[in-house]
Amino acid sequence: MPKTLTISIMEPPYESAASTTAMRIIDAALRKGINVNVFAYEGAVSLTIKDQKPHPNPVHGTSVEEEKHPTTKEFVASLFELAKEKGVKLDWVNCGLCVDERGAGNWIDGPRRGGPPELHKWVQESDATIVIPTK
């Protein structure tokens, strides 16, 4: 039976390295055949917003194509694809209360709405839990 890792993250996209670090940990766990639960709350519910768009960098004079600005929605979508390829589970819950406060409900495919009871259950059932707070 595969091991399970639960990660709780609250850092919004593009604010610090915390969300990127969380996604790298998730990626590494999935590649090792570990099931991963993600509980996104506070600003982290914006990591999966479908309406994110790459942008040019007018300071450097680069176009969207030249800038190749990644979006967190693409990173999260690639994690769901990786889980599928590896035959492991990625369960991503966006805190419904946090989503409602922010109007952040238009997500890519994969994440689902939930709340603290899922996190509580996951912490009890997981082999390890990592909490990545915001500053």
Where are these regions (language model features)?
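Short, hinge-like loop/turn segments at secondary-structure boundaries
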Residues: 54-58, 110-112
